[in-house]
Amino acid sequence: MFTGDNSGNWLFRALHKAGFANRPLSEHRNDGLRLTDCYITATLRCAPPQNKPTPKEILNCKEYLLREIELLKNVRVIVGLGKIGFEAALNAYRESGKVEFKSKPRFAHCAMYKIGGLTFIASFHPSQQNTFTGRLTEPMLDRVFTTARTQLQ
């Protein structure tokens, strides 16, 4: 996931700087990239038309995310890339019974919420739309993952 595309270039550089990846670039599946204390998943399993998933598409893929949450036993920090990713993570963790909240945390870049022993951090997605326009800069993305690293210590 993210391997060989511009979003991945941004993501893996930030992960590398924060100590989550052994190299700053992933070009293909056998390039030697190794993640440490990090797991990457997605709300959707396919690219939606015009990059705007429908609620039905999100619902169709939800079971995969719930199953991954069930399998991952030592999660302490969740970084949601984009509002859709952040909200999907919150909803999936709530549905899995691992967290409860009365009012849903609001999405804002680098916002951090501690809920039920987990830390949720929101980030703009490193899409070309966000990076080319300057909505997301490298220092902004670096800050998200250094914050995540700090929360693990």
Please place each PLM-identified region on the residue numbering.
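A polyanion-binding, active-site-adjacent surface
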Residues: 1-107, 111-153
